[in-house]
Amino acid sequence: MPQDKLHITALEVTHSKTAPEIQELVDGVKDKIPAMTDYTYNHRARLVKPLIGYDASALALSFVPAAGEGLHSGRTPEDDEFTYHHLRRDLFSLSRDAGLKVESRYVVPSSHLTIGRFIYSKDLENENGSPDPDKMKALIEKIEEINGWLAKEFWPEHNDGTIPEGGEFNVGQEKGLHCGTGSLWYGGGDALHLGKGY
């Protein structure tokens, strides 16, 4: 996945609709979008403990909501009481209150960056085109090796209770939330509004 396409989807409002259907939804809530994209300016969710996860179609860098661990100066345990799950809940409510019917494909409250897709199976097949257990085992072992490194490098348990630089993600910090429309898979689509960072 190209770095400029990496993203975490905080809320998918809808999918599999025509461009005119999407435009009608956008037109109905355009004036409400800045409040949604700026929401993280005053509602700051922190994600920690990066790990690589995978399923049959992709690899992702996943995080969990912070719970007071590895606090940096100026941040208190109370600040972590507002979590990524609360952010998703509130964005859902803001969307619904704006008149949108939220029809997400994925409702599991995951916080992940898709970093790679399994597009072709040939890399994990033998010379006959069948799945190769040894290649699969090697892939899983490499993922487990990377996860061991991530935990050792970035988790507070392995760093005297601190989180080294690069070990946490503060949602909306650099740019605020991005609201997009169109073919959004893999970070594509058109930008409607970019929230303010903090």
Positions of PLM-derived features:
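Histidine-dependent nucleotide/RNA phosphoesterase domain, centered on the 2H-phosphoesterase fold
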Residues: 1-198
